[in-house]
């Protein structure tokens, strides 16, 4: 990224690039006449107490495709309001794990990212595979986890559903769903401006404008821009890394000609230009017979290693990613005779990713390596919901999802490549290798779920889904370019790592059933108990990188179907005169043919594989309480024992694979699954003073703890993520001005400057690289709603 693009946020050049929404919000307005005539009430944020109230508000969700209280839904779920996200300054999907239990986000950058729930679904960089956790925004399924890696702006509500899903809506998943709902256009004028400034060059500005265009049509426009200098120092040239810029907008129209029909159109665009995903050296791996392979090869190549825990790297090439993504959707809802509701959701999205990656050294072992991706997806959903209040109510629907993805794998080796890779002299030095992959997916499904209200207190729910998917793919690699003419061992090594390859046509056809049985009983008016059995399946996929396929055969590129069986037992309660909400559940899940990532040490590529069977079992709880007027506390946590029941042909950790007489594979049965902390605990709270002069001072605090976790799939002693806890504080003041409300807050993220790692990565030669969490950051935010 050029220095020009990282200019100070207070320069005239930077001010010219403020989002259009801020300009609109400052200059445009809807007449107060519309506001006076509107019958749309001002919304109360979900899960927050109303002004001057000591009782919790009802949180409304549409999890079962009809509006109802979250406490009436007999399934484990977490609901976070948009206001809570703003108060806790959680504006990226990778920070969500600091708010809710059983969620882990493995994030490096937009491509190398994945979301897991209860330890299931941690498979980043899966170009040829959908995730085990479904990500939705405004009821549209996102085929790539990276499609959710943008700033969460203008959010109404975020819901996390745990366990297999698919009998009610959208795409089938085996681990759960994260459903993000943005604020819809309003027939009451709304405008907001927000700007934040913090350490390390952090600057974020957001704006929203909403209101009526006429009696039947309302519009909404939101935009943001975020930038930072970065928090990792490159010793090679003195530059700051792990920063950059992100910006985007969302435009909406809501057409509501009468009470029986509404249509909502959404269009959005986001882009990123950053050095996100800068990995630091975490561990150089094992020393065997007095030799540390990582250090010895680095020394032989002339590289100087630096301590990553000091937030330093030593890179002689760029670390850079660009992302362009966007899409459009149309949702229409009709109220039919007899109060049936018909819903149609149509969408199109695109996602383009281009990286530039260094090899982690300050010598030219590699000039650039990575995978660029271009993805387009289409979806159509139809749902019919029966009227509420009958003995039997139900939802039936049909769903189509299509995806067309191309990727390009590239490696530009430098003169020190053979020393660093341990290949014969001349094999890789100055060689260029380029490969291409393509996969087309067509998924068709029918689903239905119904509830029998057997008595006033007892309900029985059953759901079923049938999914049929076709995937066609191919993978190629061009003949290597450059390098010296070689023979013997060097030629063999070059053919293995960079030789020409063509997989031919690869095809997969799968039929995946899903099912749900649920019994719920209203123990008292304020306590609901439930038990659930569910089954979910997710079709297989294709490795879109050559890897070992020239030796193992093209069939080795195919990944089998993942199947999950799940059981839940839990309760939901609202107690203490609606001042305490307490929910808890136990769960047991077994996944067969679990899809995960592994590392091919010989070819130095990540690849997808089926890792035998996995069992996840544990307990989760969530509570919200108002112990006294003005104070709201949220406490949640989980214990999750997730391990491989069977994983016999797993990759070996370097302390085994580098030892003399090492086996070709290892048995990891009984080992903990990668990325899954056994213990997770989160607590946050806000205290507000309602003063007679109209001012509202407040303070907030949050605490997030995660126990240690396995860093990479081979479960090396040198690749473990230590436990950590992060503490955040903020204080602010709200007040009224000119029929609007202003707010100023001072915030401190990672208050005790804890050095912690969120994700680990296999670095080659037995070493490991890590992604550091955000250091202590002090900032200030100003906001005006009017």
How should these model regions be labeled?
Residues 47-48, 52-188, 569:
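Acidic, small-polar-rich N-terminal luminal/periplasmic segments of exported/outer-membrane proteins
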Residues 179, 186-188, 196, 207-303, ...:
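Periplasmic-side early beta-strands and strand-to-turn transitions of outer-membrane beta-barrels
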Residues 37, 460, 583, 588-590, ...:
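Gram-negative outer-membrane beta-barrel transporters
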Residues 7, 17-23, 59, 210, ...:
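Conserved C-terminal beta-signal and adjacent last beta-strands/turns
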Residues 1-88, 94-100, 259, 328, ...:
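N-terminal Sec signal peptide and the immediately downstream disordered periplasmic leader
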Residues 329-335, 339-357, 522-538, 558-619, ...:
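Membrane-embedded beta-barrel scaffold of Gram-negative outer-membrane proteins
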Residues 130-132, 144, 153-162, 167-249, ...:
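Outer-membrane beta-barrel translocator/receptor signature
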Residues 254-258, 384-385, 399-401, 437-589:
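Structural signature of Gram-negative outer-membrane beta-barrels, strongest in the C-terminal barrel
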């Amino acid at each position: 990224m050029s220095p020009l693009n990282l200019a100070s946020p207070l320069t005239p050049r930077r001010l010219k690039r403020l989002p259009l929404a801020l300009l609109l919000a400052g200059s445009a307005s809807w007449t107060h006449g519309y506001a006076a005539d509107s019958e749309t009430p001002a919304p109360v944020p979900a899960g927050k107490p109303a002004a001057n109230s000591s009782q919790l508000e009802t949180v409304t969700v549409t999890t079962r495709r009809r509006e109802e209280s979250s406490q009436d839904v007999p399934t484990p779920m977490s609901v976070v309001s948009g206001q809570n996200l703003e108060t806790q300054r959680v504006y990226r999907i990778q920070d969500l794990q600091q708010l809710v239990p059983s969620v882990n986000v493995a994030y490096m950058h937009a491509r190398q990212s994945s979301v897991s729930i209860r330890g299931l679904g941690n498979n980043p960089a899966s170009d040829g595979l959908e995730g085990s956790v479904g990500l939705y925004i405004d009821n549209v399924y996102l085929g790539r986890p990276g499609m959710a890696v943008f700033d969460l702006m203008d959010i109404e509500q975020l819901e996390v559903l745990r366990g297999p899903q698919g009998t009610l809506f959208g795409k089938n998943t085996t681990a759960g769903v994260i459903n993000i709902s943005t604020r819809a256009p309003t027939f009451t004028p709304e405008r907001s401006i927000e700007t934040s400034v913090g350490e390390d060059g952090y600057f974020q500005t957001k704006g929203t404008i909403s209101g009526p265009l006429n009696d039947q049509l309302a519009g909404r426009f939101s935009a943001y821009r975020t930038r930072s200098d970065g928090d990792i120092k490159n010793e090679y040239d003195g530059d700051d890394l792990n920063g950059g810029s992100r910006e985007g907008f969302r435009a909406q129209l809501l057409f509501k000609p009468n009470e029986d029909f509404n249509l909502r159109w959404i269009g959005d665009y986001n882009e990123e230009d950053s050095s996100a995903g800068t990995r630091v050296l975490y561990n150089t791996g094992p020393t065997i017979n007095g030799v540390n392979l990582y250090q010895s090869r680095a020394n032989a190549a002339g590289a100087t290693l630096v301590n990553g825990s000091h937030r330093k790297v030593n890179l002689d090439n760029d670390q850079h990613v660009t992302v362009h993504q966007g899409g459009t959707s149309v949702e229409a809802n009709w109220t039919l005779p007899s109060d049936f509701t018909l819903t149609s959701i149509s969408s199109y999205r695109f996602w383009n990713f281009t990286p530039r990656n260094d090899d982690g050294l300050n010598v030219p072992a590699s000039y650039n390596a990575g995978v660029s991706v271009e993805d387009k997806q289409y979806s159509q959903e139809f749902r019919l919901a029966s009227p509420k209040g009958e003995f039997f109510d139900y939802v039936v629907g049909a769903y189509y999802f299509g995806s067309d993805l191309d990727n390009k794998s590239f490696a530009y080796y430098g003169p020190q490549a053979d020393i660093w890779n341990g290949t014969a002299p001349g094999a890789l030095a100055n060689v260029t290798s380029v490969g291409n992959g393509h996969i087309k997916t067509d998924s068709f499904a029918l689903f239905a779920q119904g509830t029998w209200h057997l008595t006033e207190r007892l309900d029985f729910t059953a759901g079923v889904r049938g999914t049929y998917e076709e995937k066609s793919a191919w993978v190629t690699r061009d003949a290597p370019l450059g390098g010296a003419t070689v023979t013997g061992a060097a030629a063999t090594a070059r053919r293995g790592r960079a030789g020409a390859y063509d997989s031919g046509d690869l095809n997969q056809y799968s039929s995946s059933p899903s099912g749900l049985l649920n019994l719920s009983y209203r123990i008292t008016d304020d306590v609901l108990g439930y038990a659930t059995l569910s089954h979910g399946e997710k079709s297989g996929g294709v490795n879109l990188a050559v890897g070992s396929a020239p030796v193992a055969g093209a069939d080795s590129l195919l990944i089998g179907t993942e199947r999950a069986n799940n059981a839940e037992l839990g309760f939901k309660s609202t107690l203490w005169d609606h001042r305490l909400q307490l929910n808890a559940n136990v769960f047991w899940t077994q996944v067969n043919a679990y899809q995960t990532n592994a590392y091919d040490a010989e070819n130095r590529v990540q690849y997808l594989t089926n890792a035998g069977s996995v069992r996840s079992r544990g307990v989760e709880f969530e509570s919200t309480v108002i112990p006294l007027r003005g104070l709201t506390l949220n406490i949640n946590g989980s214990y999750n024992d997730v391990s491989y029941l069977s994983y016999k042909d797993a990759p070996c950790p370097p302390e085994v694979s580098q030892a003399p007489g090492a086996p070709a594979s290892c048995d990891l049965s009984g080992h903990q699954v990668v990325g899954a902390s056994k213990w997770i605990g989160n607590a946050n709270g806000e205290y507000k003073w309602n003063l007679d002069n109209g001012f509202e001072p407040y303070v907030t605090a949050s605490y997030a703890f995660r126990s240690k976790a396995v860093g990479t799939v081979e479960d090396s002693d040198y690749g473990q993520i230590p436990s950590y806890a992060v503490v955040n504080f903020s204080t602010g003041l709200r007040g009224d001005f000119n029929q609007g409300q202003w707010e100023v807050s001072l915030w401190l993220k990672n208050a005790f400057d804890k050095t912690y790692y969120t994700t680990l990565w296999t670095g080659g030669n037995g070493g490991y690289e890590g992604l550091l969490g955000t250091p202590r950051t002090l900032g200030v935010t100003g906001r005006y709603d009017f």
